[in-house]
Amino acid sequence: RQKAYIHLFGTAQTAGLIALRRGVNAELAQISGLLHDYRKYLTGVDEKHAEESADAVMPILAKTGLFSVCEIGNITRAIANHSDKENVGLPLDEVLKDADILQHVLQNTTCAAPKR
């Protein structure tokens, strides 16, 4: 569980920094980073976790009343696409993918980084 927290908070922080550098909304990047593996850590199942995480967090984000429909769409799209490292998506998608990769590399230096 501690590794999950470290990964999620690290991905959120890294996504925010990358977003600032690239001119992408850093707040949305950080929220995306914090929630990107929601279903994976909730259920322990890795398969389809990106899409399932996006579906699961959509009503949670809406219920807060803090985000517009467009912002929720951007966050959930980035989350849904973060495991698809082979295809280039929209800027927020790419920020999250890169932050996720960096965190995996920083957390586990004994394995190779996911291919980008």
Question: How would you name each of these model-derived features?
Answer:
Residues R1-V24, L35, K63, N81-R116:
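Divalent metal-dependent phosphate-bond-processing catalytic cores, especially two-metal-ion Mg2+/Mn2+ enzymes
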Residues Q2-I6, A29, G44, K48, ...:
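Residues at secondary-structure transition points
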Residues Y5, F9-A12, Q30, V69-A80:
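Short, well-structured alpha-helical segments
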Residues A15, V57-M58:
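Generic structural marker for isolated residues within well-ordered, non-membrane alpha-helices
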Residues G23, S68-V69:
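Structural helix-adjacent loops and short alpha-helical linkers that scaffold large soluble proteins
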Residues A26-G44, H49-S53, V57, N74-S83, ...:
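His-Asp-centered metal-binding catalytic motifs of divalent-metal-dependent phosphohydrolases/nucleases
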Residues L61-S68:
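Inter-helical turn/loop segments and adjacent helix faces that build the functional surface
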